[in-house]
Structure formats: structure tokens, C-alpha cells
Amino acid sequence: MPSLAASVWRGILGFTCVSIAGFAPWALAGRWFHRTVGEAGLYTVCALVFIGLSGPLLHRLIIGPGSLARFYKLFSVAFAAYSVAWIIGWMSLRGHTGSLVGLFVGTAVMGWMFARAFGAPETAIKAIAALFVLNGLGYFIGGWIEGSVSGLKDLFGVALQKSARMTLAKLLWGICYGIGFGAGLGLAFHYCQASARACCRELSPRSDSHPGDW
């Protein structure tokens, strides 16, 4: 079974990869998507990429057999709810206020759904706090980096065209977002499965001697 540190690292590494792919439609073809399907359509496409790629990279955050199907069943609904809340908050209020409101409502819904799915409602507050704080840090630090890099005339002495700078800046935002949200997911899943891990240890007291098996 994964330790707390292992869950966090799995979340960071897995979701950072997912996030780079999820930000790619905006970074590489944002204007085309805006013209073709609009802002909400672009965010929907990004959300579908996040959901579709999350399973292979993150399903081992769930302990026990059948983790891939169980992960998709839970995460697809939870991330869809999170995305809807964020999109509504952002498009209604805009700016940092819209982002904060969307992030809080979205992560609150996600954390509650995780806790309920694992029959551990007492862990909801911890899961929500982990998701909101770490997601928020990754999002806003990434936004600051995106703004800084997009305004540079050169990077490490290498001149970059504006389009290249903008693409790089957006992908760097995706990396920061992935690190923060991934860490939050690792913590949230670990918190919500505390009872399940305790039961597994009682049923298999020697399992801790094989930490690499999970």
C-alpha cells in the first residue's frame, strides 16, 4: 500500500503529465478553439483531456483491485463537477475573484465526493483543504510565471518569437498547476482511504514488508 509520500509523488508526477496535455489545446490552438467552439467549448475540451488521461496515470492512487475502472467512475464525475464550478465562477466574476470562487466551490465538491465515495465523511474537510490550498498555489504561481515569461524578450539569451513565448508560458502554467493539484489529489485520496488501509493491514499484517508490491 502506498505511503503518504508515495501518494503525493504519484499525484504530482501523474497529474503534471496530465496537466501539460490538458493545457495543450489552449497553449497550441487556443485561438482556433475560441473561434470554433467559444471559450466554454475550449475549457470543455481541456477538461475532457484531463479526464481521459487521468486514469492510466493516477488510478493507482486507489488501493485494491479494479482501480482503473473505479478511478474513472469517481474522478470523471468529480472533475466534471469541479470544471463546471470553475468555469461558472471564472466566466461570471472574472479575475482573481472568479478564479478563487471557482476553485473553492470546485475543490469543495470534489473533496466531498471523494470522502463520500470511500465512506469516510469525516475526512472531507482535510481532503477539501488539501485540494483547495495546493490547487490554488499551483494555479496562481503558474499564472504569475505565465505572465512573467510571456513578457520576456528573450529566454536565457535566446530570442523567442511572441507565439513561442506565449506557448511556453502557458505550458509552464500547466506544469505548475499539475504539480499543485497533483499533490492535492495525492493527499486527498490518501486521507479518504485511511479506514481502507487500516482494514487491509488487519487482514494482511505482513503486507508492510513488501512496500514495492503496490
Name each model feature, range by range.
Residues 1-214:
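Juxtamembrane/disordered regions of integral membrane proteins
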